């Protein structure tokens, strides 16, 4: 416990909040190139084949990013836009690929929540 004199001299230091999306370097999104596109299985109570891409960002960092929605057209060397947002049942996946931008196509035949999946309005 510091004395009042020590507090007058030094003061209290504020704790730094931990950055959850360090690879984006403070940007809302980052462009990157897919180095590997693969499927992986989720943590214990869930069961599926989740689509994930390994992406080298323009910041020079390589991250794992989740590909949301049903079906995708991504392969190695595809240009993608990456945003923050983890996938709770995939350990180590803290980023998501934005559908409908750069080389990523939107989800086909999507009727609801279209803006999240880059799907155009059906005529």
Swiss-Prot record:
GO BP annotations, alphabetical order: translation
Name listed for the protein in its UniProt record: Small ribosomal subunit protein uS12
Subunit structure, interactors included: Part of the 30S ribosomal subunit. Contacts proteins S8 and S17. May interact with IF1 in the 30S initiation complex.
Alphabetical keyword list: Methylation, Ribonucleoprotein, Ribosomal protein, RNA-binding, rRNA-binding, tRNA-binding
SUPFAM superfamilies documented for this protein: Nucleic acid-binding proteins
Family of this protein: Belongs to the universal ribosomal protein uS12 family.
Listed Basic residues bias regions: 9-19
GO-annotated cellular components: small ribosomal subunit
Family matches, as PROSITE patterns: RIBOSOMAL_S12
Gene it is expressed from: rpsL
């Amino acid at each position: 416990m510091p004395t009042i004199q020590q507090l007058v001299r030094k003061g209290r230091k504020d704790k730094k909040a931990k950055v959850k999306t360090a690879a984006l370097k403070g940007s809302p999104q980052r462009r990157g190139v897919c180095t590997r596109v693969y499927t992986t299985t989720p943590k214990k109570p869930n069961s599926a084949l989740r689509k994930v891409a390994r992406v080298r960002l323009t910041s020079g960092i390589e991250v794992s990013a989740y590909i949301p929605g049903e079906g995708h057209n991504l392969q190695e060397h595809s240009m993608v836009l990456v945003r923050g947002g983890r996938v709770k049942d995939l350990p180590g996946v803290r980023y998501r690929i934005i559908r409908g931008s750069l080389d990523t196509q939107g989800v086909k035949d999507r009727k609801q929540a279209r803006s999240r999946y880059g799907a155009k309005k059906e005529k």
